[in-house]
Amino acid sequence: MGNSFRSDRVAVEIQREINDILRNKVRDPRVQDVNITDVQLTGDLSQATVYYSLLSNLASDNEKAATALKKATGLFKSELAKRMTIFKIPDLTFAKDESVEYGSKIDELLRGLNDKSEY
């Protein structure tokens, strides 16, 4: 129970730091439009899934961003080690956040229902 609060705090800190590292340290143009939306940590803080979103919906941009993020994982871990005061930096796994697209799809469906009900 108490561990959940700690993992939530660490996840928020990791999210903030990775966003900062993306903006200030990573020079790869493939991650220019990447935004970290969430971080989920395991209870023992050994694994972190970092969810990201892109401004572009193109599949090729998504693949390029995923490749660039995977390539920069070492940089993220070393920077996190310098910035954070936890014993071990978790292993990072990047995953595209589908919730933004899902929310847009739901919004579109709801607008479609509203349009039909106006007839």
Swiss-Prot record:
CC annotations in GO: cytosol
SUPFAM superfamilies tied to this protein: Ribosome-binding factor A, RbfA
Major location category of this protein: cytoplasm
Entry's Gene Ontology BP terms: maturation of SSU-rRNA
InterPro entries: KH_dom-like_a/b, RbfA, RbfA_dom_sf, Ribosome-bd_factorA_CS
Subcellular location: Cytoplasm
Alphabetic keyword roster: Cytoplasm, Ribosome biogenesis
One Pfam family in the UniProt entry: RBFA
Any one Gene Ontology molecular-function term assigned to this protein's record: ribosomal small subunit binding
Similarity comment: Belongs to the RbfA family.
Function: One of several proteins that assist in the late maturation steps of the functional core of the 30S ribosomal subunit. Associates with free 30S ribosomal subunits (but not with 30S subunits that are part of 70S ribosomes or polysomes). Required for efficient processing of 16S rRNA. May interact with the 5'-terminal helix region of 16S rRNA.
Subunit: Monomer. Binds 30S ribosomal subunits, but not 50S ribosomal subunits or 70S ribosomes.
Protein's name according to its UniProt entry: Ribosome-binding factor A
Source species: Lactococcus lactis subsp. cremoris (strain MG1363)
